[in-house]
Amino acid sequence: MCNVYSKGFIKSGMLDENGREAFSEITSETKNKIDVHRSKNEIALIVTKNNRVIYGLESLLAIIGNSFPTLEKIARIKPFHWFFQRLYKFVSYNRKQIIPSEKDLTKDNCVPDFNLKYRLFYLAFVLLFSAYVLGFYNQRLFPNFKNNFGLEFFICCMQILWQSAFMGIYLKDRIWDYLGNMMTVSLLGTLLLIPALFFNFSQVFYFIYFGIVVFIMFLEHLRRCRILKFGIIPTISWMLFRITFGAILLYIVSNS
C-alpha cells in the first residue's frame, strides 16, 4: 500500500522519481539511517539536506506541505491532526489486510506490528458499512421484506463468528490476518453493489448482478488465500457459510 501513495506522490510531482525506495530493496546505508522496525509501522522519510528522519503522518505532511503548505497547516490544527493521526494508524496497521503481497511472508517484509484495537476497528467498520449497504440492496431483491439492516448485520456478524470458529483451529495465530483479508473481500463486494443502487432495474437484474459480485468475491478470496498461503480450506468454509445463510435468508423472506 505504501507503493500506491508513494507512486501517487511521484506522479503528482510532490516527490522526486529517485526519492522512493522499496522496503525490501533498501540499502545498508539507508538501514543505518532509519529505525527499521518503526518504519514497518510508519513510513520513513529522510530529509537529505540534514539527514533528519521523520515517520508516519509527519512524513506525509512534510511531502504534502512542500506543494500545498496551506493544507499542511490545516492538517496540523489539533482536532484535525488528532483525527488524521488515528486515521493513519487505522490504515497503516491494516494495510496488509487491505492490499496483501507475496513478500509479506519473506524475511525482509514490511508487515506492521499487530494492533488488536485497530484490527477490531477495521472489522467493525467493514461490518457496519457492509450491513448498511446490503440492507438497501436487499430491498431491491425482496421489496416486501422489512428490517433489512438488522438481518444483514446479523449475517455479517455470523460470518465473522463462523470463520473464527472454524479457521481459528486451522490457521491458529494467523486468524487475525485472515479475518482482516476476509472483511476486505466483503468490503470489495459492498463497493461493487453500490453503483446498482443508483438505478431502478428489474428484480431479476439485481439477483443476477448479486451473483456476479459474489463470484468476483469468491475469486478474490481465492487469490488472497493463495498469496498468503492459507490453502483452500478457508475458501471452502467461506462458501459453505454463503450457501447456508443464503438458504436461511430465502426461507425467512419467503415465510415473512
Residue positions per predicted region:
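Hydrophobic core of alpha-helical transmembrane segments in multi-pass integral membrane proteins
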Residues: 124-133, 160-164, 246-247
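Local sequence-structure signature of Cys/Sec-based thiol-disulfide redox active-site neighborhoods
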Residues: 1-17
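Alpha-helical transmembrane segments forming the membrane-embedded cores
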Residues: 135-239
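Thiol-based oxidoreductase modules, predominantly thioredoxin-like and allied folds used
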Residues: 14-31, 40
